[in-house]
Amino acid sequence: MNWAYDGTELVQRIVQWALRNDGVRAVLLTSSRANPNAPMDALSDYDVSLYVADTAPFVARGAWLADFGTVLVRFNDERDGDGMREYSRLVLYEDGTKVDFTIVPAEFLRKIAKTPNLPDYLDIGYRVLVDKDHLTDSLLPPAYRAHIPHRPTEAEFRALVEEFWWESTYVAKNLWRDELMPARYNLDSVMRYDLLRRMLEWYVEAGRGWSWKPGVFGRGLKSALPPETWSALEGTFADASIDANWHALFQMTALFRQVAGNVAMHLSYEYPQGMDTGVTRYLEKIRQME
């Protein structure tokens, strides 16, 4: 497998392919490989936006994807955004290269160039690889501010805390019933990756002036958090035994209590300790039930 970081050869192939294809009017490289401040390694994707005269030929036929290598697996997606449909072709090639192609009508790029703010996917970083019609001449430079969490209002902070403690009751109920699957769904997907992750990001942001850009699903938290906080987070992961998951639940609530209390202090908000205490007693009562 080719684990080259800079992808110079692949980028050159994409550029030459676009120059030969009259239907492709502009090509932009976006995301981490176009952001000088973003972490990048051998497994970083290539995010390539193709601005085309007509999307139909590129959407209906996928043979063009093989122009950049032997396709190992691919995934197609499409969505509406800003009144225009865009299409994704996510491709993993046999040499280990992963490219996320986005196919967009060229007129959309002209529209973006006239707006006062870049969309998030361009604000995180972009490089113009091809521009046959000068569509990007007026495009704003990236500010690299997209996806940085904003300072929550007190209502937003309170809502997240309430949801965390509410979800903990589902975990307790399902652990008592010996229902591991729903218990782990609430513990991992909801409490950890949705709620605790966001509180941990707020914790980091509060100490960095709301300027740190987290990665998806908590990427980057290990290096951003104090070692003891990361160690406490590791303690919230459990094996498949019910007892281990009870332990993980209480480890998670203890960590959340500590981090949320710290965030509340930084923001001069009130942490609802009474609710915390009451729900914790409820969880302990469920655990002790016969």
Regions found by a protein language model. Give the residues of each.
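Conserved NTP/Mg2+-binding pocket subregion across the NTase superfamily
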Residues: 3, 67-182, 187-188, 288
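Surface-exposed loop/turn and secondary-structure junction residues enriched for glycine/proline
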Residues: 27, 46, 132-133, 203, ...
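Conserved nucleotidyltransferase catalytic core and NTase-mimicking acidic/glycine-rich helix/loop elements
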Residues: 147-290
